[in-house]
Curated annotation (Swiss-Prot):
GO BP terms in the entry: pheromone-dependent signal transduction involved in conjugation with cellular fusion; regulation of DNA-templated transcription
InterPro entries attached to this UniProt entry: HMG_box_dom, HMG_box_dom_sf, SOX/SOX-like_TF
Biased composition (Low complexity): 192-204
Record keywords: DNA-binding, Nucleus, Phosphoprotein
Post-translational modification note: Phosphorylated by MAPK2.
DNA-binding region, residue range(s): 201-265
Name under which the protein is recorded: HMG-box protein STE11
Subcellular location(s) of the protein: Nucleus
Compositional bias ranges of the Polar residues kind: 142-153
């Protein structure tokens, strides 16, 4: 029986030989009969049966015995119900029986390193007193608590066998449980992006960043480098109205940012020296043909959307200004309207494919100082070259002009709309009509840009021709450093050569 393994010192301290199974308890019961307080010892084994031990009686005065019994009943009742249920769940005790622990210490040894040295003047502490005693002990010994949480036995730093290094480690752990200071939290939240200043406040977005934020979701790719390159090309070819709209949005963003952060000042962070930090420089990514091919497809698709949107906006703008140049002078309205019909008829007849080239193309001027090409496409202004290798100017010009005959209306508009189109009042030297001559006249001016050389060379393999613009005509320069005018009617002899200085 488990009761035989119990050692007693008859003072109140009872310990089991196997402390992990120390579930047996020893209690005393006091019964008052006719002014005499009788005490009986009861042993409560693991199975919950009460075994009565030989009784012995102690005579106590009536008043003193009654007070002692009441104090014990009030102090032990809560401890009896909560303590056994918490520490010994397997123990089933009938609380209706008067079994009260009266020992000076707890009946079961705790495996926790916290040892409570209770005073003999308080034989049966209440639950509140136990909690207050535990809190005071933990506040006085935080190092032992940390050791108990980590699973290691407590170590006395002042004992001869105590290790100073261990105590220092435990103290450090105890200090780490303290709340983090505000300065440390602010350092952890320091900005790591280039768009933030040293104060942690982000800079206001500019017009391009706002444009990128809106267009990023419409690009069907997940590569950030490709997205950046595609949006950069889209931004370069975006319409002026669209760029102005995003510029206004950026201005409102700056005003909002200034109101929200009035004391904000951008302070860029200093770049770390790679030689001192020891980090290797960033490696360049290898070329991926499939990625470049997908990127080019997406770029073409997005640019087509931009060009289509640009052509629609231009069509709306021209629809509002339709025939406004004819109504500028009321007295010349009839003559200008008739000249407009004549030029459309001439251009329609001359733009038919398969017609032989004529050395004397039709030249019709309905506004003083304006000359027009046979198919109403203005000639580009190329930069002057020092030498052009074997260029047949007549055939080359004819090849350039007939290149537009093979274009559809949509391709013709896309080609023309890629360039800036000032109004008629700004430049009268570039007035032209659409290919079929069904819409209102459009003013197109192709500026002096080296990129314009690729416009015609992509359609037909013909060498580029350097042209020198003049007020009256266009002078072609050949490899012999002589030039002559291509348009007949100004000089009767087309072979007349004008020296170029």
């Amino acid at each position: 029986m488990l009761g035989r393994d119990i050692e007693s010192d008859w003072i109140g301290n009872y310990w089991g030989r196997d402390h992990s199974l120390a579930l047996n308890t020893f209690s005393k019961m006091s019964i008052e009969k006719e002014g005499v307080l009788y005490q009986k010892d009861f042993f409560v084994p693991y199975d919950g049966l009460v075994e009565e031990l030989p009784e012995h009686s102690i005579e106590i005065p009536e008043i003193m015995g009654q007070d002692l019994l009441n104090d014990r009943l009030n102090s032990v009742e809560d401890v009896q119900s909560s303590y056994y249920g918490r520490l010994m769940p397997g123990l089933n005790i009938d609380l209706s029986m008067p079994t009260f622990p009266v020992s000076n210490e707890l009946p079961v040894r705790l495996s926790s390193p916290i040892q409570m040295n209770l005073s003999t003047s308080m034989p049966n502490p209440t639950i509140e007193q136990l909690h207050s005693k535990t809190k005071s002990y933990v506040s006085q010994n935080p190092v032992n608590m940390v050791g108990s949480l980590s699973g290691s036995p407590p170590t006395d730093c002042h004992s001869p066998g105590g290790n100073s290094n261990t105590c220092g480690t435990l103290k450090t752990r105890a200090l780490s449980l303290s709340p983090v200071s505000s300065d440390t939290a602010a350092k952890k939240k320091s900005p790591s992006r280039s768009g933030s200043s040293s104060s942690g406040i982000k800079r206001p977005l500019n017009s391009f960043m706002l444009y990128r934020r809106d267009k990023q979701s419409s690009i069907p790719t997940n590569n950030h480098q490709s997205i950046s390159r595609i949006i950069g090309e889209m931004w370069k070819r975006e319409t002026i109205e669209e760029k102005e709209r995003y510029a206004e949005m950026a201005q409102r963003e700056r005003e909002r940012h200034a109101k929200e952060y009035p004391d904000y000042k951008f302070l860029p962070r200093k770049k770390k020296d790679r030689s001192t930090s020891g980090k290797s420089p960033r490696r360049r990514k290898t070329f991926d043909p499939s990625l470049e091919q997908d990127e080019s497809k997406v770029l073409r698709m997005m640019l087509n959307q931009i060009s289509h949107k640009k052509s629609q906006s231009d069509a709306e703008k021209f629809k509002l200004d339709q025939y406004s140049w004819l109504l500028s002078e009321e007295g010349n309205y009839d003559s200008q309207k008739g000249a407009f019909d004549i030029i459309c008829q001439a251009n329609t007849n001359s733009s038919q494919t398969g017609l032989p080239h004529s050395n004397q193309p039709s030249e019709i001027s309905f506004i003083p100082g304006i000359y027009t090409a046979p198919n109403s496409v203005p000639l580009p202004i190329f930069p002057v070259k020092n030498k052009v290798e074997k260029v047949d100017t007549h055939n080359s010009l004819d090849g350039y002009l007939h290149t537009f005959d093979n274009l559809s209306d949509y391709e013709f508009r896309s080609l023309i709309n890629n360039h800036s189109t000032p109004s008629v009042n700004d430049s009268r030297l570039g007035t032209s009509f659409n290919k079929s001559c069904t819409d209102s006249p459009q003013s197109i001016s192709i500026y002096d840009d080296i990129k314009n050389l690729d416009i015609f060379s992509e359609k037909k393999e013909t060498p580029n021709v350097s042209l020198v613009p003049t007020f009256d005509s266009t002078i072609f320069q050949d490899d012999s450093a002589y030039g002559y005018d291509n348009f007949t009617g100004i000089w009767d002899d087309p072979s007349y050569r004008l020296p170029v200085f």
